[in-house]
Amino acid sequence: MCTFAPTLFKFSQSTLDLLEAMNPDVRRHFPDHPLASTTFNFGPRTITFPHKDLKNLSWGLCSVTSLGSYDPKKGGHLVLWDLGIAVEFPPYSTILLPSAIILHSNTSIGEDETRMTITQYSSAGLFAWRAYGYMPKGVSTQATTWWKHPKHMFSRVWELTQRVQPGQRMSALP
């Protein structure tokens, strides 16, 4: 996320930094991580039906990591229904996707195979709380259009390629 959506990364991270500063009892699952929540799906044959994660930040990114032992050519594909594609999703791979706005699922795997997932995400409510001045919506006098400004959070290809030196791989970026 830091590499492909650095502005969104900083916004997410600063929101959690502020939350931690205001409440010392709040701790992240992983230090300096920009996503607030983590779900471990232990399987042994984790699959999902087509869904959108409607409580996540609509213009945020969700991280999904696939684990286990299965043949990614035969099953465990990530299906992005709105795009009309199924993507091979091998074990120990991670993808970032806007899970609140893209209908997604994954395909089943073989009877003798295993598949688990780790999903990381942030609730839209955390960002609304920040936009409302750290007060409930009914109490705040802040503008209620905070969710309308996501366009500047995403990187353009030319911005990303400017950060890459000749011969450097994208995966080597900070």
Regions found by a protein language model. Name each.
Residues M1-C62:
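Conserved, ordered domain cores of eukaryotic regulatory proteins
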Residues W59-G60, S69-P174:
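Catalytic core of Fe(II)/2-oxoglutarate
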